[in-house]
Regions:
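A short, surface-exposed loop/turn module that caps and links secondary-structure elements
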Residues: 32-58
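Enriched for short, Lys/Arg-rich terminal
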Residues: 2-4, 8-25, 58-64, 68-86
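PIN-domain endoribonuclease scaffold, especially VapC-family toxins
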Residues: 24-32
Length: 86
């Protein structure tokens, strides 16, 4: 499965590399779990965001991984910092 990053998500991911390695490890674990188990099953309490038409998993209490898989089976990372309601 190819991983494609929205520009803002990639910037957030790079920021985690210098800000918090523990969070970066958690994000990587969530991505691996999505690749293994799919959109709706696995760690991080997968949740469909009906208004955004995307999926969300908990990185921690304050941050969510927002993602989707397109028709070509590419995993799109939309955001990995903050909360979708922010």
């Amino acid at each position: 499965m190819n991983k494609l990053w929205a520009d803002v998500a990639w910037d957030e991911y790079l920021a985690w590399q210098s800000e918090d390695k523990k969070t970066l490890i958690r994000i990587n674990s969530l991505i691996k779990d999505i690749e293994t188990n799919g959109l709706a099953v696995g760690i991080g309490k997968p949740e469909f965001l009906k208004y955004l038409k995307r999926w969300s998993r908990r990185i921690d209490e304050k941050n969510r991984l927002i993602y989707d898989i397109d028709e070509n089976k590419n995993l799109w990372i939309i955001s990995c910092k903050g909360h979708y309601e922010d």
